[in-house]
Amino acid sequence: MKNEAEMQLDEKQENAVMAAVRNGIMILTGGPGTGKTTTINAMIEYFHSENMEIMLAAPTGRAAKRMTEATGWEAQTIHRLLEVNGNPEEDENPNRNGFARNADNPLETDVIIIDEMSMVDLPLMNALLTAIVPGTRLILVGDCNQLPSVGPGSILKDLIASECFPVVMLTRIFRQAQESDIVVNAHKINRGEPVLLDNKSRDFFFLKRQDPNVIISVLLTLIQKKLPKYVNAKPYDIQVLTPMRKGLLGVERLNSILQEYLNPPEPGKAEKEYGDHKFRVGDKVMQIKNNYQLEWEVCTKYGMTIDKGLGVFNGDMGIIKNINTYEETVTVEYDEQRQVKYPYAILDELELAYAITIHK
């Protein structure tokens, strides 16, 4: 539980908590730094005090991990919440949707809070709603100004525009968030105002270069030397974003260059060529389509399986841990130490992820 000093709410945050208490469904939205997480914590504290069962979830493993860290309560991916056990697109029973939790076997809880709703697509939202029984409170949280999901639908924005549900929009940027120029500039961009460019900023920098090759040179210096020293980050913790896939500064060329600099070939380091890609042990990779049949497992350092399940999803990122030429498999470790063995035949579901598109 958060202490009282941390849980002081402004009027809109209090309204959001009351809306969550009084309604079966409500939407909490707002930009970065507006106190969505603090409001979620206040909701959790109230429902917990009423001895109500609470489930927290988010669309991706990374978002679920952040939610866990921010609330102190265990959060999981929506796929894991629903216990994926097949491909929803191939399941002929509309009540199942490829998940163990469905209309015939609904979620047993009083409250469900979903964060990062802007990333939820239509099929996943349908599966979630199918598994919720009347009487369960559903709280949807997200930033409606973020890019919509990679899959079909713009769920959060459409639900807000429908005016069918209680919506609380947080607009006040709290003092701690105001110290971040990223947060300040995000709100300026949303308002159509020029951003602040200050060389003394702690977290927002603009380096103007014209020549693509010079840009790449600066990029490599930042990743290999400057940023690891400045923010104490490993090169693998640094994500390069670009708006395009093709071209001199597109994802494909950048990944090829970054791979050679950050994870060059070495004697004894296994690699596998697949089409235009070359995968190497130690590479940062991303799953680029939903695969509901892929098995994952979590093992101890002695190889004993302690958890396992199905499903790896579009946008999941991990590190190649092993390439077994005898088995013809590539093993990738994802968040929460989940390891997946990819047969060579489905390596088209992976791509290098040193650089990714902004939408991804």
Question: What are these model-derived regions, one by one?
Answer:
Residues 5, 121, 256-260, 264-360:
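Conserved nucleotide-binding/hydrolysis modules and their immediate coupling elements
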Residues 2, 6-9, 14, 78-110:
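P-loop NTPase nucleotide-binding/switch module
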